[in-house]
Amino acid sequence: MDLSVQVGSVALRGPVMTASGTAGHGDELAGYFDLSSIGAVVVKSLGADPWAGNPSPRVHQTPAGMLNSVGLQGRGVEYWRTEELPALLASGATVVASIWGRAVEDYARAAELLADLPEQVVAVEVNLSCPNLHHGSDLFAHDPQAVTEVLGVAAACGKPMWAKLSPNTERLVEVAGAAQAAGAEAVTLINTVMGMAIDVETRTPRLGAGRGGLSGPAIHPVAVRCVYDVHAAHPELPIVGVGGVAAPEHAVELMLAGASAVQVGTATFADPRNVARISSGMESWCRRQGVRRVSELTGGAHG
C-alpha cells in the first residue's frame, strides 16, 4: 500500500496533515501521536511581528463545528524559529510553515525571515484570507491582483508556496488560477466560511470581534464543492483539501473531488489523535477498496 503523495514538488509520506491554526506552532501534539507518522504538521500562521489577536471571547461552539475569531495571535516568525521549531524538528515531523500579513509588506518581511529554513520544512503556506488594510480591508484572497502581489514577495521564503484561499468569493476559480500563475505550487482549499452567532439573552454577538470563521463538519460540503470546481478548471494545479474532515471518508471525498492531500483541523479540538486516526483509517479504506496507491484517488469523481 503506497500512501505517498506529491503536492507540486513536495513529496509527502502520507496524504493527511494538520491544518494551520489547530495544532499550535510546534510539537504540541507530540504527546498524542508520532508526528512523523503523518504527511506534515502545518503550523499556525506566523506574522513578521508579534500580534495580540482579537478580543475575547474568541471561540463559540456551533451544532456542527465552531466559530472562531482568534485573530492570528502569535509571537512572530523569529520567536518560532528559535523557540518552537527546534522541538518540532526533533520530533521527526515534516513541517509546513504558514505566514500571514495585513499588507503586502508584512508578507514580504515574514517571508524574508523564513529564508534558509532546514530541509525538513518542505513548504510555506501563504494565508491569503486576511484583510488588506490598504484596500478597504477586503481579503487578499478575493482579489487576483492582490494574490499576485503577495505571492510575488512571499517567494523570498525560498520554499514551495501553497496559497490558502477563502471560499467567501465568487471568484475562487479565477483567484486559484492567479495564484498558480504567480508561482504557487498548490492551493489550499478552503479557509473558514464567514459566520456569526448572537446570544439571544444578552442580545450581543457571541464573539468579541462580532463575526468569525466557521469550521468543522458544517462546511465540509462547501470544501468539496470548492475543490471540485478548482480541479475542474485547473486540473494541473495541485490542491490541498481542508474543511470539515472528521472521518477517513471525508478525506477520501476531498481527494476524489481533486485534492492531492488533505488537512485535518477542527477535529483535533475534539481529540488531538484524530489526525493519526484519519490517516490510518484512510489506509484501511484503501485496502478494503483495493486501492494500491492513495494518489490514484485524486480527481476520481471527475470521470
Residue ranges of predicted features:
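N-terminal capping/small domains of soluble enzymes
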Residues: 1-95, 100-101
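Conserved, mostly hydrophobic/aromatic
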Residues: 18, 41, 80, 97, ...
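Catalytic cores of alpha/beta
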Residues: 27-32, 105-117, 169-182, 231-236, ...
